[in-house]
């Protein structure tokens, strides 16, 4: 998935979280590679060091330093913010499991916090960023869909709900693509029933995706191959009613005229 686009909202919120640094009165400094070693430091110094590493795109070190803020100053008001910034830093560094764990820890400690929606959104983004091509296992894709749906259910009026909805559409399109890929695989091997079940899944569950017209055409093909012209006609009719101008309907019409003109 397009990381640049999906990161935009996450970056915007992280800027809001970091903007509070000015309230601490922190200045320069931040150290070098020794920043992540355990050295007792005041919260200002630690948080500033983490922010500098984040600004420098040194995400893993930034995450470790934000973790240190919580570890060394667990009762500071900045510990809670550091937890969430740790999750964001891991996300930006593409350490998605670590980001998810950090966000879940934040939610377990602060379930009703005003930034809880952002934590749920970060978790969803971490799964979303890991969606692979349609030829691979889709477990991560399903986790992304579930997490994005949770953002919508829990916080329908939040700034994240609309973006989650857009991503859900993309994830559904991806899942439909997987079903189509498997269906075509079976079809090439003349496994008509198996292929028809995959195409039917797309029509029934992912009818709003870009794959629906082709799925209806493939159903027309497979039903004809199985000697079921009446079922083929139904699929072609649905295709014509919903996608009359598509190339898939033109092909289905030609197919029906050639193989089942009386159906």
PLM regions and their residue ranges:
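Sec-dependent N-terminal signal peptides
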Residues: 7-13
